[in-house]
Amino acid sequence: MTTQNTTPAGFTGNRNRYYNPVSKIQSLIHNLDAELVQLCKQCSVQKPLTSLNNSTSLGSHFSNFGALGGGSGSKTMGGSSSMGSNNFSPDSIGNLLARVRASTPLPRTVTSSPTAPEAQKRQMRNVYRTRVIDAYRNRRIFTVYGNYHTVRRALMRRGWLEKLPASRHAKLQSMSEDALLEHARRGNDYEAVVISKMINHFPAFFIWQGKGQRDLCAEVRPFRNRVRRSQFLDFSTKVGLVGCAEQERWYREDGVCGMSYPRFYRLGGNNLEERMAFIEDYQQTQARSLLLYVREHQPAELISENGTIFSTTLDFALGKVKKMVRHAEHYSLDDARIKPPTPAEIVENQTFMVQSTDVLKSNAKFKVSEKVMAEYARLAGLYLDQIESLRPDYRWDGSRNLWILKPGYQSRGIGIVIRSSLDDILQWTSNNQNKKYIVQKYIERPLLIYRTKFDIRQYMLLTITDTKVSIWTYRDCYLRFSSQEFTMDDLRESIHLTNNSVQKRYKNKTNRDSRLPKNNMWSLDQFKNYLRIMGAPDGSWSKTYNGFKQNLVAVVMASLDETELLQNAFELYGCDFMLDEHYNPILIEINSTPDLSPSTEITARICPMVLKDCIRVVVDLPKNPTAATGLFELAFEVNYSINKGADGKPLELNGKQMTLFENMPRMRNSPRTRLLRKILNNVKTSTTKKVEKVVEAPAKNVKNPTAKITKKKKLSASAGSSTAASAQPSTQNLTTKLILNPATRENLALQYTAPK
């Protein structure tokens, strides 16, 4: 009897395809069991007691392995049930897997899988809550408004947690906490929003906010990037900077504190005295401009036989400058008081303004000899040197008498215009009263680089503790160039305003010097290299940087009287300076919210550095006095103390400003007042009637014979009564004591002394 080996389809030609199906299934079960154990450990869930790799269960699964192929198979193989034979049918393997699934407790594993995400959420929630509580106890919760990502990253590296403002990730903040936990991963936005939701009811201990925002969480004294002060000494506005410039003379100290600032006038209000002071300054500047024009030109270029300007114009200008020198040398309050000019002086001033304008703008000629003009030029130089030594800011003036008009509370070059005509200036400020314009002398002789105007952006940090006010200056800065070459013949903003917000709207002029940067910015190293190439004196930059510090210290000191000294308050300022021809800095303005965006490769490098170093000074230094402060340098420090009462609270004096000559509101009459008024009216009526009867009665009815009225008095009384029919008697008759009985006098006294 021959036996036939039946080879299942699919097994021919490849004996090792299913080499050991039992070991294959066992390996799969081991892998699944290991994954289940790992998942249970992560979710803190106990592993099912029945193990899938139990040898006993596996033996029971495969004890009847030979029978899974069917009875016919065993007969065909000669009754052999050996497992060494690898000739199996596909149905036998499928039945084996089904048998294994049916006999093992897989339903327990399936039912426990939905609880794993919930357990993971609980674990993540507990971890986040622990971090939140720890951050609150260590005062490490912060809120940042705006796109100051450098500040966020710097604080997060220090272990701080962010309390998100409502505008940041608004869509994610509208989701539930469970939905956020499903997608939360380390460092992603979902995790940040989950932590912010948990931290929402805790105060923030570091707040970076805008200037106009309300100060929140004041009770915990957070680090806040805002220092509040009154608007009259808020140097981050034009109006406040003017107020500080008026006060800084009381704090001036050579080498420490001093302010270089173009002279200014507030023409935005109805201050007539300041308007008159500006007109006087404008006329004085016109006189100096004319003398500068004469000094800068040769005498032969200024004269002509057909000239229309006489020497009296030069005499008037010299007289003006002489008067200025006398006032500067012997300055007193009487000299400072502006007196209204006489009619003759008004005519003389107007004549001078017309003729000097013809010379400066139309190149009109003088009708004098060359020798006389040379003498005028010598005197002009003499008096100009005297006044410039007394007033260094006059060295910045030229011969154009230009003034720059700035809105009092605007920034980024908005609303700024340049004018030279007095009428145009006064008309512009009158038409824009709501903008509170500041009129400032334009710097006509600045330091130029390759015939182009520039300014310097310097950073200052102001910090306040419970006992000190610290002024920090940054040792790095950058230059901003105009896109056009400098000229006084064209007054467009693209030439004279170097703000990046203004210059980015214009293209660079094609014939501009090729050595200037295309992005209109230089780093400090590039500027130092330029100074070395141009042969500037040694120490020029040190002189400039020390001037920066002196200006900023003077501004802060002048504003301290109106500054709220709150512990942990700080503020970062962007300060704009120009340089004169001798590398002396001139303060232009101070911005409380400087632009820190990476607009160019220069700002992309320096702005993040400034923010990182700011966090070092504000956050790290109070905890560690030896902590690094980056490039911030302590320029000045002021110690202060607040007088406190017995209860430990600062002493305060609260009051209300008294207003004189104000019509007080009429009070509502009480019942008692109305009753008194009614009684007084009745008394007044009865008294008037009695007086009229006494006046009209003949003298014989009066008991006292000495009280007879003379004929002359009778005539005057009758005349008075006839002209004022049924009116009150004349004052003469009323004041005659003899005709008033005691009852009448009592009634009159009651009438004029009772409360109204």
Swiss-Prot record:
PROSITE patterns: TTL (PS51221)
GO molecular function: ATP binding; protein-glycine ligase activity; protein-glycine ligase activity, elongating; protein-glycine ligase activity, initiating
Class of this enzyme: ligase
Binding site for ATP: 440-443, 453, 455
Secreted listed as a keyword: no
Gene3D superfamilies xrefs: ATP-grasp fold, B domain (3.30.470.20)
A Pfam family assignment: TTL
Name of the protein in question: Tubulin glycylase 3B
Species assigned in the record: Drosophila melanogaster (Fruit fly)
Taxonomic lineage of the native organism: Eukaryota, Metazoa, Ecdysozoa, Arthropoda, Hexapoda
Recorded name of the encoding gene: TTLL3B
